[in-house]
Swiss-Prot record:
Gene for this chain: rpoC1
Biological function: DNA-dependent RNA polymerase catalyzes the transcription of DNA into RNA using the four ribonucleoside triphosphates as substrates.
Lineage of the species this protein comes from: Bacteria, Bacillati, Cyanobacteriota, Cyanophyceae, Nostocales
Name of protein: DNA-directed RNA polymerase subunit gamma
Organism: Nostoc punctiforme (strain ATCC 29133 / PCC 73102)
A GO BP annotation: DNA-templated transcription
E.C. numbers: 2.7.7.6
Amino acid sequence: MRPAQTNQFDYVKIGLASPERIRQWGERTLPNGQVVGEVTKPETINYRTLKPEMDGLFCERIFGPAKDWECHCGKYKRVRHRGIVCERCGVEVTESRVRRHRMGYIKLAAPVAHVWYLKGIPSYISILLDMPLRDVEQIVYFNSYVVLSPGNAETLTYKQLLSEDQWLEIEDQIYSEDSVLQGVEVGIGAEALLRLLADINLEQEAESLREEIGNAKGQKRAKLIKRLRVIDNFIATGSKPEWMVMAVIPVIPPDLRPMVQLDGGRFATSDLNDLYRRVINRNNRLARLQEILAPEIIVRNEKRMLQEAVDALIDNGRRGRTVVGANNRPLKSLSDIIEGKQGRFRQNLLGKRVDYSGRSVIVVGPKLKIHQCGLPREMAIELFQPFVINRLIRSGMVNNIKAAKKLISRNDPSVWDVLEEVIEGHPVMLNRAPTLHRLGIQSFEPILVEGRAIQLHPLVCPAFNADFDGDQMAVHVPLSLESQAEARLLMLASNNILSPATGKPIITPSQDMVLGAYYLTAENPGATKGAGNYFSSLEDVIMAFQQDQIDLHAYIYVRFDGEIESDQPDTEPVKVTENEDGTRTLLYKFRRVRQDAKGNVLSQYIYTTPGRVIYNNAIQEALAS
């Protein structure tokens, strides 16, 4: 086996490709000296043999074999012939997966403008040429001629547009016997555009623009700066303006635009194949018309159709009529495949499905601490399975991975104990789409729960913008020690109390919490059950309430030796009683204090309700933990 080659790279740069580079992408030289790579036929596969047609859109000579280690004609079959190029069919004997990256190219019989740079916003071609977009379109789509060189004609200027009649008039003057016009050049179509772009001297243009900007003001200055910025970018990247007009177009690998046979014998194919077929057909027809020296008007019409076919291939619907397939559905062009939510970048590169992740519906978990989440058992055993298997083997409970998996599938009780050990101190990350700010993904300590729903603390809902009407959340397990440390130190819910946008607290009590706190501490004079009773501790009060001995809002006395704060002054006793044993009882507004003869406090009972005791007890427990 050959060692796998790993190419180290820092970034991917997207820019203009020169015709030479496009040709390099697809061109290969066979051992017999034959150069392959150009796609010349619109055919895809032979419907009798179901094999790709040579020089077609699925050609095995250009893109590689359709079957592993097998050439087109069948002379070489087996891995032992690796690297051999069949002398009969010219197909290299290699793996079929090369068809995922080998490209081809189509050499165009006439240059065509790239629709992104022509019809994009802003139109870079029109900015560079300093012409209105409407005029540039007139040239590209063969509606108007453009003066490439005025020569000695006084009535003509460089880049001036001419109608058909005006050009015929000038042509008559040029070819008349007593003609004085010399050096007049007029063009039409993308060829004229190519000439205009090639004539631009970027450095010289940038220099003169900088001088003009110094004197210009207002709208004109803004326009000049816009043009200078484009020119500077061309200089910085080393791209040439004429590369925006294509003489060669790349053909993407066949496995990225597949053709598959359906059950009924029919074929389903990617829309790109239809768009490429249109381009090849029109290109071949144009080449044939040029060969037989067809009338100019016919050739020009074919060039316009080729331009439209390439436009549809690159960005269908950007200009002119949208090309539709069967059942009037617009065909998906290269731009449609790249852009949008379902495009290659967002769907396949940024939005990959990842291992060690799961998703489920969320339900409220009011008994959880803010840094905890309830993770269903069956989800946890799946997510943490490698860790559990490792722990089972290390502890000697099983000898190999297969035995460990069998133990897990049998739901052996020992597995749950191991799982508890594994998840202790191992944070998980919860994410709710759409992740609009950094608090859309936070980490929690998992607590194993029954059922199939993830339990979420109600206080973190505003950060996730979550509610419990069927929302789903994704769980991700950080694997490396570094990621676990980051999850614990930076992403733990208890560390994300303030909103990154406003700096105000995002974890604030609301709804049930506020209502519950209000109800516990509210006054209700009608609550009389157990009113006036004395209790020796806060725990006794809670126990009496749980046994339904007292009402939640009944006023009672409970012994409490700590300090008491009140929003109302309570320093002067309302009533003082001298007891027979020499002690005194001081009755304040909210407490009852018993003192000895020296004034030392013997006991203190506070006047409160069971609801307030429960509320106070909950806060004390939270602070203590």
